[in-house]
Swiss-Prot record:
GO molecular function, a single term: growth factor binding
Protein function: Binds human IGF1 and IGF2 and bovine insulin.
Organism the protein comes from: Haliotis laevigata (Smooth Australian abalone)
Superkingdom to which the source organism belongs: Eukaryota
Disulfide bond among keywords: yes
Record's protein name: Perlustrin
Any single Gene Ontology cellular-component annotation: extracellular region
SUPFAM superfamilies: Growth factor receptor domain
Amino acid sequence: LSCASCENAACPAIGLPCKPSEYVYTPCGCCPQCPLELGQPCGSFTQRCQFDLWCLRRKGNKIEAYKYVPWHLDFKGVCARVDV
């Protein structure tokens, strides 16, 4: 992943209505977006899930969950609640 300067970023319109205090940012950190909701697909190159959710996937008998999915992983999951 190579990030250009945010000065020239063409940010997409913010999707679902959310408060500015809830904004999360695209992987390069330039564009504010609303966080993903329960059940929405998430991964390395999406915005984060809502603050009380994790990006989760099942892999065989194992469950992997990330609060902040590292950009360098090939990770695709679904926003879900996780009891730790």
